[in-house]
Every structure is written in C-alpha cells, then in structure tokens.
C-alpha cells in the first residue's frame, strides 16, 4: 500500500474504531501515512478538568511559506445498532462500488483523499514550494473542547502561521462538486427558567403556573423573526429544543418550568447584540398578561451556554478561486458558495487564517450504513491535487 491510494487510505482509517473520545489507532495510522512522505508529525494530548483527554495530530511538510493547512477529524459518532448495518461499521468493506464504514464521509474520507493528493503531488512534482500541514483532531464530534481549538493554540505558540486552510468536511448535498462552504452562521444557546408557585390544578388562584409564563417567553423568542437574512446568509432562526416542568402529576401545577433554545444567526448580529435582543424580548414578554391575566410579570432567569460560536465569512479570493476552478476542471460543475448548515471546526480556524470547507457528499453521514462511492474518492483526490497545484501557484506568485 502507498499513500497515493485514497481507497486504501480510507480503509485503513475506517478500521480504527475511533468513536469520540477514543483515538482507536486512527492517528497512529495517519502518522504512518505522513511520515514516509517527509512530514514532521507531533501528537498532542489536550486536557481540561471535567473532560476526557483527547489526542490530536499536527504534521508539517516544509518550513517556508506560503503555508497551506488541511484540517479535519478522525473521531466518529457511535454506530448505533450494529445489527442494522449491511456491512460491519469498522470493516471498510466495498460492495457495488461503495465503501461502507463509520466515518466514510464524515470525515475520514476527506482525510484519506487529501493524503493521497499530497502524495501524488510529491510523486509528480516533489514537495510543494512552501509548506503543507495537517491539523487533525479526535474531538470534533464531541464537545470540541480538547480538539482543534487547543491544537491551534499549541501550534501558534510554537510559531506556526498559516496563509489558508481547507477543511475536508462533507459539504456536498447531492453530487461531488455541488458546494463549497465559505462561512458559517453563529450559534448561541440558553436556558430560560420561569419560577411560579406550586399548587392544586383545581385551585389555580392559589398557585402561579410557570408554564403560562414560559409560553409567553418562548413565543416572544420565536415571533417576530430576528431578521430576513443577508446577502451571504439565510435568516437567523431560533428553535426551542427542550421543555421541562419536572412534574409527573397531572393534577399539580408545577413550581417551575424551563425551556432550552438554540439560535443560528447571521452577520446581522454579534453574540453580544443577539443576547441583548433576546433579553429585551424576554423582559417585554414577562409583563404580557395575555396568558396570565391579573398577575404580576413572570419571574424568570436565563443561563447562557458556554462557548457560543461566532458567525464568519471568508472572502479570500485566491483560496476560493483556486478551489472553485479545481472543482470545475475535475468534476465539471461550478460549486455554489454557501454558508448553510451547522457549525464546524472552521469556526476556530477563522481566527488564524482564511478558511473554506470542501469534501465528499454528506447524505449518509452519521447514518447506519454510512458509505461513499469509490469513484468519488478518486474524484475528490484529483480535485484536491489540482487545488494544491493552483493554490501554491497563485500564493507563490
């Protein structure tokens, strides 16, 4: 086996059961692919009290600029009901032109293809006129506390600087070449608790039902809309994700009621301005007597979740143009430049250099029978190799 073969690379990685937070041998396998290519490889274990220690990998080829980073993760989500899989989730079996296994598209496949692309570039042209690095974590599918964010800090403290980054997440909804992610919405979560007075459901005047107040508050968060979208982002959207009263009895008015929410927001907002708007809405709704006639304003508190994600947009023309033209040349289609979807580790990388995301088709990620077309692995490798050639030609000019 040589690192130029993306299929063999991916089979090796899938056969490592690296369900977060387990390394599972995946970083060891990646190390074994990169070291013979001339990369200097560091294994970095990150820790934080109350969380699982996570092993990460940073590898660099070359010492000069320009410097291109590829970022990704070898950790995967649990397999679910293994008996429901057509092929064992860590066997990496090929059937009818598809390679099955947990992580096939999210995102061991992207890593396997970029390794193959770099190996082919070296085989054809020698090392690049600059530097290529791999920044790979084992904590993307988990809490993301001991992963990319700490690996970036570790590398930056040692003098590492990057000119651009490609994240190999599965960005394509239907076909390879559909979409490049050039930014991501921000994400902010919180929990509202309304405090009432417990009592008998038949005597509501002797109690104060917090559910009524909670309904007022959550309604105010969902309507009216926060905005109508911007040129680069879809409208901000808030979803109530949990509702709880902790009350199993149908004839008891509960003492408190809580609801959690998450909002994905565009570049009309910052975390600070969005929090202020949410607090304004809650304060106004607390005094709304529609559901609580004759009652004083609802008593409530709000707790914000740690580590909100900030919205970002990449406008680096050289990075986007090099990748777009590579996709058009190899796949024959012009990719959409999108900011849709959830968050990724690009939210951390954007603080260090321009970053975009492009990988495989994501239709089966996290599903039973996660799989990738073998032909797509070859196509993605060719796209990545062409991108490497064009980015260094542009960045070095």
UniProtKB/Swiss-Prot annotation:
Zn(2+) 2 binds at residues 106, 141, 366. InterPro entries: ArgE/DapE_CS (IPR001261), Bact_exopeptidase_dim_dom (IPR036264), DapE_proteobac (IPR005941), Peptidase_M20 (IPR002933), Peptidase_M20_dimer (IPR011650), Peptidase_M20A (IPR050072). It comes from the Bacteria. GO terms for molecular function: acetylornithine deacetylase activity; cobalt ion binding; succinyl-diaminopimelate desuccinylase activity; zinc ion binding. Keywords: Amino-acid biosynthesis, Cobalt, Diaminopimelate biosynthesis, Hydrolase, Lysine biosynthesis, Metal-binding, Zinc. The active site is at residues 75, 140. Zn(2+) 1 binds at residues 73, 106, 169. Its EC number is 3.5.1.18. Pathway: Amino-acid biosynthesis; L-lysine biosynthesis via DAP pathway; LL-2,6-diaminopimelate from (S)-tetrahydrodipicolinate (succinylase route): step 3/3. It catalyses: N-succinyl-(2S,6S)-2,6-diaminopimelate + H2O = (2S,6S)-2,6-diaminopimelate + succinate. Its cofactor is Zn(2+); Co(2+). Binds 2 Zn(2+) or Co(2+) ions per subunit. Pfam families: M20_dimer (PF07687), Peptidase_M20 (PF01546). Belongs to the peptidase M20A family. DapE subfamily. Homodimer. Catalyzes the hydrolysis of N-succinyl-L,L-diaminopimelic acid (SDAP), forming succinate and LL-2,6-diaminopimelate (DAP), an intermediate involved in the bacterial biosynthesis of lysine and meso-diaminopimelic acid, an essential component of bacterial cell walls. PANTHER family: ACETYLORNITHINE DEACETYLASE (PTHR43808), N-ACETYL-L-CITRULLINE DEACETYLASE (PTHR43808:SF31). This is Succinyl-diaminopimelate desuccinylase.
């Amino acid at each position: 086996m040589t690192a130029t073969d993306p299929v063999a690379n991916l089979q090796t990685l899938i056969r490592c059961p690296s369900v977060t937070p387990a390394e599972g041998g995946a970083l060891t396998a990646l190390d074994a692919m990169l070291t013979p290519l001339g990369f200097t490889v560091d294994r970095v274990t990150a820790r934080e009290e109350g969380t699982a220690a996570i092993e990460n990998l940073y590898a660099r080829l070359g010492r000069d600029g320009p410097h291109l980073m590829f970022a990704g993760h070898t950790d995967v989500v649990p397999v679910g009901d293994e008996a429901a899989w057509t092929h064992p989730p860590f066997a990496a079996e090929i059937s009818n032109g598809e390679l099955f296994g947990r992580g096939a598209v999210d995102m061991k496949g992207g890593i396997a293809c970029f390794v193959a692309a770099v190996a082919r570039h070296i085989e054809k042209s020698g090392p690049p006129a600059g530097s290529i690095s791999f920044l790979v974590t084992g904590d993307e599918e988990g809490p993301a506390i001991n992963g990319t964010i700490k690996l970036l800090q570790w590398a930056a403290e040692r003098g590492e600087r990057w000119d651009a980054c490609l994240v190999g997440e599965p960005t394509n909804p239907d076909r390879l070449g559909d979409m490049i992610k050039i930014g991501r919405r921000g994400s902010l979560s919180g929990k509202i608790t309304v405090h009432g007075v417990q009592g008998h459901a038949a005597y509501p005047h002797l109690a104060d039902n917090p559910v009524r107040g909670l309904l007022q508050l959550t309604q105010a968060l969902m309507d009216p809309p926060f905005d109508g979208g911007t040129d680069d982002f879809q409208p901000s959207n808030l979803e109530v994700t949990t509702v709880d009263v902790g009350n199993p009895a149908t004839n008891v008015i509960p003492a408190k009621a809580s609801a959690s929410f998450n909002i994905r927001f565009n570049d009309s907002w910052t975390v600070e301005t969005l929090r202020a708007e949410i607090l304004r809405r809650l304060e106004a709704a607390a005094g709304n007597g529609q559901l609580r006639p004759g009652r004083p304003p609802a008593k409530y508190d709000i707790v914000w979740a740690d580590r909100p994600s900030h919205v970002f947009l990449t406008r680096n023309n050289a990075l986007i143009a090099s990748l777009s033209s590579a996709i058009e040349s190899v796949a024959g289609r012009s990719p959409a430049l999108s900011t849709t979807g959830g968050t990724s580790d690009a939210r951390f990388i954007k603080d260090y250099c321009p970053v975009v995301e492009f990988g495989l088709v994501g239709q089966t990620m996290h599903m039973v029978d996660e799989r990738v077309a073998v032909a797509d692995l070859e196509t993605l490798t060719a796209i990545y190799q062409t991108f490497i050639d064009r980015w260094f030609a542009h960045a070095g000019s």
